[in-house]
Amino acid sequence: MTTPGPTPPREPAKAAPRQAGLLRSTAVFSSMTFVSRITGLVRDQVYAAVFGANPAMDAFLVAFRIPNFLRRLSAEGSFSMAFVPVLSEYKERRDHAEVKELVDRVTGTLLAVLLVLTAVAVLAAPWVIRVFAPGFDGNAEQVELAAQMLRITFPYLLFISLASLGGGVLNSYRRFAVPALSPVLLNVSMITAALALAPRMQQPVMALAWGVFAAGILQLAFHLPSLARLKLLPRPRWHGGH
């Protein structure tokens, strides 16, 4: 009489929910990316229709390019590459309280650095513009306009960096929708500023600078409810070790 062998593990049954979750996450991310691309295209069309190509628009593009460039270096560059693996390790090996403490300390340190950087950029705005746009040197009015807008747009770096930190936390917990949808808020804010605010301003292009500022606040605020549901809403604490 043959003795039945051990029952093989049911790997496919266990893998199925994981695979379904991965497909769902991919679909959500792809959909939000598509929406972001479409709203970005609409934004560019609105820019062309409302402002056209002129020195004032060039001044705005420089004033926005500076914090956007630094965002790619910090929030989406080396900082994220360093933080996300550490957070993942904490999730696997530490309890929730220690994960929360890590998020609080990283947020506090990032906030302190960004506040100093923002203060320096706001105070030295004309010099910063000359470094990033040396072609403006012969046009004092354009430098001044770009500097005025940089003082409004540069805090976007602070808001979006904190939002990206929150997005990294959410992604590590497989909450992909909010970080993926966040760029849409920037496009919608810019479109609204161009269509609704610009006609009411003495210097219409300044509306775009305020649109950037508002977008940063919206993108940061958009992440907070999801972080709160994970009980990881940051309470910034500065610590030299992180």
Positions of predicted regions on the chain:
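Membrane-embedded alpha-helical bundles of multi-pass transporters/translocases
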Residues: 2-242
